[in-house]
Amino acid sequence: FKKKTSVINNARMVVTVADTQHHRGLYTRFQGSNFELAKIVTDNEKQPKNNRPFMKKEKSILDKGEYRKKLAKTLKGYISCTENGMYVDWNGFSSEVEQVARDLLIKDRLGLKPLDPVTIRRKESAGEGSSTPLVATGQLADAIICYPEYGV
């Protein structure tokens, strides 16, 4: 069960990263255990496996939106948003994760909903998400946005 959960979380992670250059991307709520996500981020920084201070602070980091910011930065090279949609370099992930992620994306099992463009503009006028990608703020974790006209 734990392995299945980590695979699903990895797949969710794939659809949670925004292209920081275009300030747009995909969002979803992190459900279940974030162990595998924390593992990927810490492994990416080549930290010793028995030393994961990042995981100890996981909840507070998630609360501050720092975790998503770090995750987006880590995976920026693997995922990008174009005017035609989202491009994922699957070489960075296991075939099992790829399969689940593709399935989730195609069948929309993540329960994602479009974010109204008015909401984006309102958040921008309030000073949110103007200087940093919306995904980095962690404030729109329940919504999905991928508007070609936004942030280009």
Q: What is the meaning of each model-derived region?
A:
Residues 1-152:
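Short, Lys/Arg-rich flexible segments
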